[in-house]
């Protein structure tokens, strides 16, 4: 990870990593990614399930992994774009205290503009014949295929990271609390040819924050309210202003029960560690400028 040095002291924010630097712009821009993290427990052992959907010129891809809190991979299944014809399958692995199984069926999946399927699929993770995570709308097919008990279906959605694209307007959808409503997020920022660019963020068409004098405030954080919950918004647009035209800015929306606490914010820490300690849900957006 490479963090930009903060220019806001203790209240500053560091949310950029190597994937958001201009040096890796080509790699990030060439592929559209969405990664979701789910926290769960296997026999009292806290684990993280990661589901990554990708879309490139070669086609769709899917990666599912199960890690423990130390970062050790317990089980992983990869469906590469050039192997996506294998749209149905499973993978299992015996671990120290049980057996992890991953099932998927994408044979009838329908995709929209993004890398995630919108319907006609399922992805399931099973531990010792207990269904832990189930994604998709084909639930009956998943129940029949896995033959698993549903009592452990308790994985908590803790983080989402995605890549979004635009010229000056960038859009995404987000759900900030479990079973809460989806919200439309719009980030607007025009940095080309302007002496004093401005950043504005809207939620459900309502302006919730505006940053002027962006050349001096290219990194920062601000608290907004969504669904009555405090959501801390972090931004890093340094690469838009001072990097290459192909680089991306990073935005993070983080819910926290105790937002007044001063936390050592780091993009990788938030995405991978802090939510596992009960510090809320995180949405990380990599916003790429299109020419």
Predicted features along the sequence, with ranges:
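Extracellular glycan-recognition regions
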Residues: 213
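Short strand-turn-strand beta-turns centered on an Asx-Gly dipeptide
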Residues: 204-205, 227-228
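Short Lys/Arg-enriched alpha/beta "domain-start" segment
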Residues: 6-90
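Peripheral membrane interaction modules
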Residues: 2-15, 80-199, 223, 229-291
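Short, contiguous, pocket-lining structural segments
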Residues: 216
